[in-house]
Swiss-Prot record:
Name of the molecule in the record: Tryptophan synthase alpha chain
Disulfide bonds: none
GO-annotated biological processes: L-tryptophan biosynthetic process
Keywords tagged on the record: Allosteric enzyme, Amino-acid biosynthesis, Aromatic amino acid biosynthesis, Lyase, Tryptophan biosynthesis
GO cellular component terms, A-Z: cytosol
PROSITE patterns: TRP_SYNTHASE_ALPHA
EC number: 4.2.1.20
Quaternary structure note: Tetramer of two alpha and two beta chains.
Matching InterPro entries: Aldolase_TIM (IPR013785), RibuloseP-bd_barrel (IPR011060), Trp_synthase_alpha_AS (IPR018204), Trp_synthase_suA (IPR002028)
Protein function: The alpha subunit is responsible for the aldol cleavage of indoleglycerol phosphate to indole and glyceraldehyde 3-phosphate.
Swiss-Prot/TrEMBL catalytic activity: (1S,2R)-1-C-(indol-3-yl)glycerol 3-phosphate + L-serine = D-glyceraldehyde 3-phosphate + L-tryptophan + H2O
Length: 268
């Protein structure tokens, strides 16, 4: 959890927001996936949000569903994902690493065992996409036992009770949704979210990162101007992977230029 605190403190001093890319571990295969992650970091990613392939990703649109399918087609298992995470952590000791999971994968070998494994490989946070705040107690308690930040989603229509719960239970960062629905770059994130960000700050929530539909540098700078601590982009990044499956080098080059432009916008 300290990695998030250190990151946000450093960014604050430099008056920048965080740019956080999302990819699915093992898409399109383990070797290329590790190269993709190195490229994202080298190009300026401040933290990583990583998915573990899952057969029924309810919160995700077609782009990220296809990423899951490609990882499955490559035979990627959760056990291999944890091996990848250990390698990433060894190579990049300071970057915050977050997992975006679904409850079934957490339940598989028992909730406590899952978070213990996360701690072992150097994961900093876990967001369980299909567990609402009011059902989150066993997850967040196990997370905190193992020094993992439990991440909660704050939807654009959050009422005061939900804002207070998210602020109270969340650690690391708060995932602020630009809009309702599923992920996807084609559904552009609607701003402004000033009022939610102000309330979250008032209730001492973990810093808000805006996600869902973030696909352009303008949206990153708008999120930072609205008071968010940064932005998360998933589908736009995964589309670059999808578009360049036949040319892995071109894929990495395009990812590098996209991430560096998005990171530059966080300094606005």
């Amino acid at each position: 959890m300290e990695r998030y605190e250190n990151l946000f403190a450093q960014l604050n001093d430099r008056r920048e927001g965080a740019f956080v890319p999302f990819v699915t571990l093992g898409d399109p295969g383990i070797e290329q996936s590790l190269k993709i992650i190195d490229t994202l970091i080298d190009a300026g990613a401040d933290a990583l949000e990583l998915g573990v392939p899952f057969s029924d990703p309810l919160a995700d649109g077609p782009t990220i569903q296809n990423a899951n399918l490609r990882a499955f087609a490559a035979g990627v298992t959760p056990a291999q994902c944890f091996e990848m995470l250990a390698l990433i952590r060894e190579k990049h000791p300071t970057i915050p690493i977050g997992l975006l999971m679904y409850a079934n994968l957490v339940f598989n070998n028992g909730i406590d065992a899952f978070y213990a494994r996360c701690e072992q490989v150097g994961v900093d946070s876990v967001l369980v996409a299909d567990v609402p705040v009011e059902e989150s107690a066993p997850f967040r308690q196990a997370a905190l036992r193992h020094n993992i930040a439990p991440i909660f989603i704050c939807p654009p229509n959050a009422d005061d009770d939900l804002l207070r719960q998210v602020a109270s239970y969340g650690r690391g960062y708060t995932y602020l949704l630009s809009r309702s629905g599923v992920t996807g770059a084609e559904n552009r994130g609607a701003l402004p979210l000033h009022h939610l960000i102000e309330k979250l700050k008032e209730y001492h929530a973990a810093p808000a990162l805006q996600g869902f539909g973030i696909s352009s540098p303008e949206q990153v700078s708008a999120a930072v101007r609205a008071g968010a601590a940064g932005a998360i982009s998933g589908s736009a990044i995964v589309k670059i992977i999808e578009k360049n499956l036949a040319s892995p080098k071109q894929m990495l080059a395009e990812l590098r230029s996209f991430v560096s432009a998005m990171k530059a916008a966080s300094r606005a």
